[in-house]
Amino acid sequence: MSAFEVYRRKFKPALPRAIQGASYHLHTEEKTHPVADEQDIAALFPKTTHLPLLDIQPDTGAPKLLEPKRVGVIFSGGQAPGGHNVLCGLYDKLQQIAPKSVLLGFQNGPKGLMTNKYVELTEKFLEPFRNMGGFHAIGSGRDKIAKPEDFDAAAKTAKDNNLDIICIIGGDDSNTNACLLAEDFLKRGLKTAVIGVPKTIDRDLYSTKGIECSFGFDSSTKVYAELIGNICYDCLSAKKYWHFIRLMGRSASHITLECGLQTHANICLVGEEILSKKMTSRQLFEYLADCVTKRADSGKNYGVCLVPEGLIEFIPENNELFAYLNNTLLPHWTGELTADAVAAKLPDPLRTTFMAIPASIRTQLLLDRDPHGNIAISQIETEKFLGAGVQQVLRERGSKTKFTPLYHFFGYEGRCAAPSDFDCSLCYSLGAVAAILGCNGKTGYMASLRNLVRPPADWSPIGLPLTCLMNMEMRHGHKTPVIMKQMTDLNGNPYKLLARNRDTWLMNDDYQNPGPIQQIATESAEGTAVCARPTITLIEEARK
């Protein structure tokens, strides 16, 4: 264990004032409704739809200790900084409100739950993982509880281990699984409560009803922003490269937007804006070429451009092209597969779209296929797609502008980072909220916290019904209940802050280097230290 890890284990995560002790009460608030498709959701989830929101408030009465509980917990999906503190917060709160409770960590995600593979999480077991990054205490996985036999297996595990609670720590798909499992257990008459915890660095698991920020977003964006800040200063020092930096976020641009606000990169592309303007690939290349040319005209043949990894899928014409290739043309293809041969077989509008894609990327599209033979959109290097597009436009214009692109992808660097103070306390508090909800027999709820721009003592713990996040979407040709992903709000304050400063940041070298995550308080006043500051996104969203 490194000197840093030894030091970091000593940090004491903060809890909201309402749940610092063992005296609290659950206040029932308004009945909730699904975010869309209410009739369909209510028909599929008759036992958990329209549950009330629960506000956990402090109680001045004597602590009411509960009987020991048997609790299972899993990580589901990709890693995010702070996950281990959810386990620690869950364990510590269980021992406080239901002494001698047993916590079982099912290994490697939902598969561990279905196969009954677990390790008991004790004080001694958890000690090395407090305030540490990663999910390696019990591992994670992307298996889904989807088939009837999967639900049977999960129910068998719950019964065999006499579980009172199962806590699922994951993103939108994982919490959709939690919602399905809660409903299934109620239909079976099982006593096991199912509680979800919101995890995703992408921050597409968000709700105005009570999810202000999923854990991991704070730490990961601060890691990426540090790296981007370093590149900005390198860019300013060398004055000869354009850096195209792809950032995680296939479905939403929250990470890219936050990093742009932290670093003042010259260009920060927001996929949702491109979608709203119905931009074509060619229009995007033209815009970027204009930006490069404007800076070059000012003697600046360098810059930094931030790109969400899912950008290509925000361009409407690309989705039409990919759908036609995957569903109509490629399944019946015979003979040599070349870009020219494919172009000759495409109808006119789609041929134009295909030929607007740089030649090197066209070849990659056809060669990189998933196991089903479809174009592997997630494998497209978006930053190179844009850089090649700019080169193509400049070449067609006969421009003498000097343009030397360099490419970066920041993704896995941030998923298992040592969590920030914010994420340490957020995760620890989420674990505690999950324990309270489950120990009080609540099922089909997500543990959450409000007022996150305040110091942790002022955070408001709540239980949010999972069904109020649900809608129906087409998956594999069928309408399926899922938690709705939340995209970047183009009417929201964070985006407006970018829009107001976009032209200035493009032309000026107004770079900011936020530096590494600060983990030592430098001011005495609570909440004023650099290490205590939340993201700019949260601060801006809290502004009225």
UniProtKB/Swiss-Prot annotation:
Active site: D202
EC assignment: 2.7.1.90
Positions of Mg(2+) binding: D172
Required cofactor names: Mg(2+)
Sites where the protein binds diphosphate: G78
A single GO BP: fructose 6-phosphate metabolic process
Matching Pfam families: PFK
Pathway given in the UniProt record: Carbohydrate degradation; glycolysis; D-glyceraldehyde 3-phosphate and glycerone phosphate from D-glucose: step 3/4
UniProt subcellular location: Cytoplasm
Cellular component terms (Gene Ontology): cytoplasm
Residues at which substrate binds: T200, I201, D202, K240, Y241, M248, G249, R250, E309, Y412, E413, G414, R415
Residues marked Important for catalytic activity and substrate specificity (site): D173
Primary role: Catalyzes the phosphorylation of D-fructose 6-phosphate, the first committing step of glycolysis. Uses inorganic phosphate (PPi) as phosphoryl donor instead of ATP like common ATP-dependent phosphofructokinases (ATP-PFKs), which renders the reaction reversible, and can thus function both in glycolysis and gluconeogenesis. Consistently, PPi-PFK can replace the enzymes of both the forward (ATP-PFK) and reverse (fructose-bisphosphatase (FBPase)) reactions.
Full protein name: Pyrophosphate--fructose 6-phosphate 1-phosphotransferase
Organism, as annotated: Giardia intestinalis (strain ATCC 50803 / WB clone C6) (Giardia lamblia)
